[in-house]
């Protein structure tokens, strides 16, 4: 039997000074892009020296292949410098540095990968709640992935690592290709066990090839494997031994078990108590026997390690022990007792990065609990499906309360599902109500993926059916564990020619499509999500446009005159170029208005020039690098001059605007918003999409645009892929319009470009649709488009602290906003711009409270009495009969809050705010009951994007127009500059959406 202190020499000739390696424990502490942090270097340096080798945790080989946040990357050459520092820190004390390389495959959560749908051998989701169904990799993608692994090995060598460990375990991509559960292919990469070994073998071959190219005969190559899978069908131990024999034949330095205990027995047949290492030694081939094998799991003290070697392992891998005992190897070899727990005050001393420290409890796996979990899954998969026949109604939790679901059962089958969605929001939820029931019926399983963009509604349907199953005497837990069928995958390619293709089904895309249809063009609109709507359907519906004749019928509010007087006093040096001429025109207009006020004419003023100047000043910002930005004049001039054109066009298309009130959205600076009578943005989506259908326009959902087709600098078409893998190749006679939105749901992309905010938290919430991940910007940039303003991102100050959503709680007009901090004090002009408000929120702790009374509650247009009552019960809104009681409930000083409200009410009476200069006042806070809505900034709008001209033509990096390519909406930059006014987003999408449709139709 080998001893812990014995050296070991690998086939490559590399020698380790003992039989201990530090296991590749994920510490989740890399930069947002996967770069090495100093915390990581310190962590590994503190643990090196004693062990023969340190295996550094999973490094993703492709940008969208992360399995967890804070993952380490080796996907680009830019990572080499940081990895070099890491390797040097490990090797400086005598340990060999080995880097584990992997791709998560279907385990790549879109949340950690910019919203990108995961990939795998086949479109089969993992057996876990809400698992995303992956895209099946094409043959070309498989070859590219093998090259990516080779590139990763090359970078590891350049960074100075002594070897790599190929991560073929933990249900990640390499294991997925070997697994009969996740690999249902019938080509050279799958179909039988022999072909399922092809991908792991190809990765090994590529690894060896790269090492040979560097003349690195002494480069360590290891392979980590999970011996079994619980899934049906899944990897069994005999299968694993077949794979290991193939790998060993090609030459390896070691195999590395991946399991929670070195003494673990089978998870497939737990009644068989024989340890897997014993089975391994009995079944090993001659080739496998020559490769050292590492045992892992449950090795806390020297005795554990020695027992593992005695059981048959050649080496031991220590994970959790090294977390709390950085010198574990030295202590174990000196027969000292190793710590098994860390004191709460030891984080700094142990050099444990904060992300790891915060999740260490969750990283310590309870082996007994894991065994029970596996046994439970196995039992549930064998439970017979039986019901008490009949019709049962149960409920799930939807957006607006309980969602009734009526399910009809036979004795062994779900026969029918009827969802009563009458109280749910239109548009965005519809696919969930149609698709989820059908998928349940087709598969007779509750193991169903939620619909992208309709997560809450999807879960409500699933929960409703689950509850109905239990009412009918069935076992909903068993149905949730029942394997889902593989997606019927298509290798079909559809090729056709149309006049125009529009990418994105939000307001900009629908406007462009309808405009082109009006001009007699054939148009196809592609939407990657199951439902159209994008961010537009999530808005409050406010559309800015200066309409002085209409606005002049409304009285001026207290504070508005003061706002205009301050604006008129702005130094002319603040204005650049043609904006100065507009400012001079505006000052003359204001002189006339002030005269009218003196003569008793108390009306609301507005003009196109005021809208333009406020858009300019509202967007004029300087970033952290001292770079200033403001809206490109001709783009802003076009937007503000043609805004009423857009309002009239929308009215013509059936939008019924409420002319009884003129409103000011959050951060709008002025009352000029037009709003439909039907609440929220769904009115625009509903009416415009119906017009498109009436004119035989084609809207294709579940279809993701991937690449523009460019010929001699001109865009001549676009490629896309549908949810079932069908490829679309669409040639265009006129052009392609990109209207796919910004990247507000892609935190990594925001952090990559950010130059404005001091910090963007990894867990910051967003008001955006999860579809908005910047793919349209990436597609355009690949075709040569110039990007502008990418460093600026707008935060919505009044986001929901839990979800990031905008339209929860009491969202009232800003003239009725009253913000207080945790000291119960006001701290800002509540009518200020969004970035100013967000910064003020951060300066006051991030979370603040919006205070309202019963009268102000009645002005909330985002909600209903029923929703308010529900949100009070849930704690989204806090209600009290007195201000004193409200202060107690939200934890602010009672006297401060009552004084603050008294002072605010005095400002309303006086029509001016000496301390914060609030620009408009509405109602006082005086009628019980009183309300507080907690709010916190969330990502709302990304300011940068593709550069366009006033014809919505995309501009290339050479400054020239890219023929055949147009863009509109948040996918573009240059209009709003550093900050967008509330209400300007919708007028932007409808104005430039129409312009894009016009230009593409007319071949401008």
From Swiss-Prot:
PTM statement from Swiss-Prot or TrEMBL: Is flavinylated on Thr-455 by ApbE, encoded in a neighboring gene. Flavinylation is essential for catalytic activity.
- Name the GO cellular-component terms: membrane
Cofactor binding note from Swiss-Prot or TrEMBL: Binds 1 FAD per subunit.
Which residue positions are annotated as catalytic? 834
Give the E.C. number(s): 1.3.1.125
Q: Does the keyword Methyltransferase apply?
A: no
Induction trigger: Is maximally expressed under anaerobic conditions in the presence of acrylate. Under aerobic conditions, is highly induced by acrylate.
UniProt GO MF annotations: FMN binding; oxidoreductase activity
With respect to pH, the record says: Optimum pH is 6.5-7.0.
Q: CDD domains, alphabetically? A: OYE_like_4_FMN
Name the cofactor(s) required for activity, per the record.
FAD; FMN
FMN phosphoryl threonine is found on 455
Instruction: List the Pfam families.
Output: FAD_binding_2 (PF00890), FMN_bind (PF04205), Oxidored_FMN (PF00724)
Cited InterPro entries: Aldolase_TIM (IPR013785), FAD-dep_OxRdtase_2_FAD-bd (IPR003953), FAD-oxidoreductase_2 (IPR050315), FAD/NAD-bd_sf (IPR036188), Flavocytochrome_c (IPR010960), FMN-bd (IPR007329), OxRdtase_FMN_N (IPR001155), Succ_DH/fumarate_Rdtase_cat_sf (IPR027477)
Binding-site positions, FAD: 508, 527, 535-536, 540-541, 775, 941, 970, 985-986
**Keyword Signal belongs to the record:** no
What top-level class of enzyme does the UniProt entry assign? oxidoreductase
Q: Matching NCBIfam families, A to Z?
A: flavo_cyto_c (TIGR01813)
Q: Which family does it belong to?
A: Belongs to the FAD-dependent oxidoreductase 2 family. FRD/SDH subfamily.
Q: What is this protein called?
A: NADH:acrylate oxidoreductase
